[in-house]
Amino acid sequence: PITIGGESRRLQATRIPTYLCPSEVRDEMRLKNGEPYHFPLNYGGNAGTWFVFNPAANSVGQGTLCTNRKLSMGAITDGTSNTLFWGEVKAYTPYFRNAGISGSIPMPSDPSLISGLGGDFKSSSGHTEWVDGRAHQTSFTTTFTPNTVVPYLVGDTLYDIDWTNQQEGKSMTASTYAAVTSRSYHPGGVNTTRCDGSVQFETSNISLPVWQALSTRNGREVFTED
């Protein structure tokens, strides 16, 4: 625990202003049994396109925030100005996790298919744990373009969800694939940071191939931005 303003609390429940966007509508502590538990974040690391981590092979995806890895600038062979580092995410995102599908999972092209992949549904806790380090809490992927609605309908409630096949570190066999969409409350797009430190506003109508190319550190894609 740490002491802030005379109050003792867990470090994980500390509000870090740098991690939060002023537009976030739920800039609030997450509670557990009425007690401070976690605090959310609005900036997730680039975990690549879809594949995140294979525990059996200890292999990782092509993003810049990788499980059990530290990357040097030299690893970003696509160029630091052409590679995403951080992107906006919404706090308290609903998601599915731990479907535990074995083997390779093809990257889906239709957002409406995501909920059918299954798993344990959590209605409002994605991107609420800045200390967690797993894709659905502290990252984003470029499976879909920014602010794409990934629908899951329960009765009259439509959720805009994320999905991760397996929490990193929870299985030695099931790989982590993740559709964790970059989202914001800004009209028309999301704020991002590239590996050279520059800040860019990426529009929601960016082409998917370009968006995905920006998320690979060594994909050698050739693309032109609008």
Task: Kindly label every feature range from the protein language model.
Residues P1-D226:
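Internal low-complexity, small-residue/proline-rich segments
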